[in-house]
């Protein structure tokens, strides 16, 4: 059970870090390339 919990925590941290890096790289405030910003 301990190894399963470690694997689950590793996957969760990996996806959370991926989501955070993707959100920061696709931030519309830093890259005003979208047509929504006038």
Swiss-Prot record:
Q: Where are the transmembrane segments?
A: 4-24
What membrane topology does this protein have?
Answer: Single-pass membrane protein
Q: Which Pfam families match?
A: PsbI (PF02532)
Q: Which GO terms describe its cellular component?
A: cyanelle thylakoid membrane; photosystem II reaction center
- Where is it predominantly found? plastid
Upper lineage is: Eukaryota, Glaucocystophyceae, Cyanophoraceae, Cyanophora
List this protein's GO terms for biological process.
photosynthesis
Provide this UniProt record's keywords sorted from A to Z: Cyanelle, Membrane, Photosynthesis, Photosystem II, Plastid, Reaction center, Thylakoid, Transmembrane, Transmembrane helix
Would I find Transport among this entry's keywords? Answer: no
Q: What is this protein called?
A: Photosystem II reaction center protein I
Database matches in InterPro entries: PSII_PsbI, PSII_PsbI_sf
Give a yes or no for keyword Transmembrane in this entry: yes
Q: Name its species.
A: Cyanophora paradoxa
Instruction: Report the subcellular localization.
Output: Plastid, Cyanelle thylakoid membrane
The UniProt family comment states: Belongs to the PsbI family.
What is known about its subunit structure? PSII is composed of 1 copy each of membrane proteins PsbA, PsbB, PsbC, PsbD, PsbE, PsbF, PsbH, PsbI, PsbJ, PsbK, PsbL, PsbM, PsbT, PsbX, PsbY, PsbZ, Psb30/Ycf12, at least 3 peripheral proteins of the oxygen-evolving complex and a large number of cofactors. It forms dimeric complexes.
Task performed by this protein: One of the components of the core complex of photosystem II (PSII), required for its stability and/or assembly. PSII is a light-driven water:plastoquinone oxidoreductase that uses light energy to abstract electrons from H(2)O, generating O(2) and a proton gradient subsequently used for ATP formation. It consists of a core antenna complex that captures photons, and an electron transfer chain that converts photonic excitation into a charge separation.
